[in-house]
Amino acid sequence: MARRKRICRFTAEGVKEIDYKDLETLKAYITEVGKIVPARITGTNVFYQRQLATAVKRARFLALLPYTDQH
């Protein structure tokens, strides 16, 4: 069974830089437990996956996103 190749959302939209203040976008790329979803699942290319990880970590540090889920 051949799987369909996932396309990078950020490349398709022509995004220059991922902003750590854009919480709606960042929440789409973290799991319920708070982990960053890997690129092989989302289809995000390497350039944007690095920016995404940095943005999520920055947002966590500034308490915009939680590190883990609510217990």
UniProtKB/Swiss-Prot annotation:
Please provide, in alphabetical order, the Gene Ontology terms of the cellular component aspect for this entry.
cytosolic small ribosomal subunit
Keyword line: Ribonucleoprotein, Ribosomal protein, RNA-binding, rRNA-binding
One of the GO biological process terms? translation
The cross-references to PROSITE patterns, in alphabetical order and at most eight, read:
RIBOSOMAL_S18
A Gene Ontology molecular function term for this protein is: small ribosomal subunit rRNA binding
Question: Which protein family is named in the record?
Answer: Belongs to the bacterial ribosomal protein bS18 family.
PANTHER family recorded for this chain?
30S RIBOSOMAL PROTEIN S18, SMALL RIBOSOMAL SUBUNIT PROTEIN BS18M
Main role? Binds as a heterodimer with protein bS6 to the central domain of the 16S rRNA, where it helps stabilize the platform of the 30S subunit.
Q: What is this protein called?
A: Small ribosomal subunit protein bS18
Q: Upper lineage ranks?
A: Bacteria, Pseudomonadati, Pseudomonadota, Gammaproteobacteria, Cardiobacteriales
